[in-house]
């Protein structure tokens, strides 16, 4: 079964900032995941419940979920390999602090 793909604004902006060839390669990898042709690796520790899509120097943090129209793949955050998890963890912490304030 094919998953519906939902991109966050950050992922959309990140993909838009890439060169056309790089953007095309990442989009192709996303479609492979949605079609069940490419597995995602689960993340652990503070990012349990999320998965990663690896492609060259980039990483995308994703999660599986449901929409009213069926199963979906949520593309949550994307960045370069060396910074993606640290930045995403910081973003999560900021959102938690704002929700409590």
Where are the model-predicted features located?
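Arg/Lys-rich, positively charged N-terminal/basic patches that mediate binding to nucleic acids
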Residues: 1-29, 101
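Enriched for short, Lys/Arg-rich terminal
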Residues: 2-4, 55-58, 64-101
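Residues that form or immediately flank small-molecule/cofactor binding pockets and catalytic motifs
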Residues: 10, 48, 80
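Residues that form generic nucleotide/phosphate-binding pockets
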Residues: 14, 29-32, 87-90
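Short histidine-centered beta-strand/loop micro-motifs
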Residues: 15-17, 42-45, 64-65
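Conserved catalytic core of Hanks-type protein kinase domains
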Residues: 17, 32-33, 78
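A short, surface-exposed loop/turn module that caps and links secondary-structure elements
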Residues: 28-54
């Amino acid at each position: 079964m094919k998953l519906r793909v939902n991109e966050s604004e950050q992922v959309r902006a990140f993909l838009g900032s890439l060169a056309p060839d790089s953007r095309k390669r990442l989009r192709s990898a996303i479609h492979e995941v949605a079609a069940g042709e490419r597995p995602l690796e689960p993340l652990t520790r503070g990012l349990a419940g999320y998965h990663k899509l690896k492609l060259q120097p980039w990483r995308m943090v994703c999660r599986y979920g449901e929409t009213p129209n069926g199963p979906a793949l949520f593309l949550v955050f994307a960045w370069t390999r060396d910074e993606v998890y640290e930045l995403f963890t910081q973003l999560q912490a900021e959102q938690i602090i704002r929700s409590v304030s």
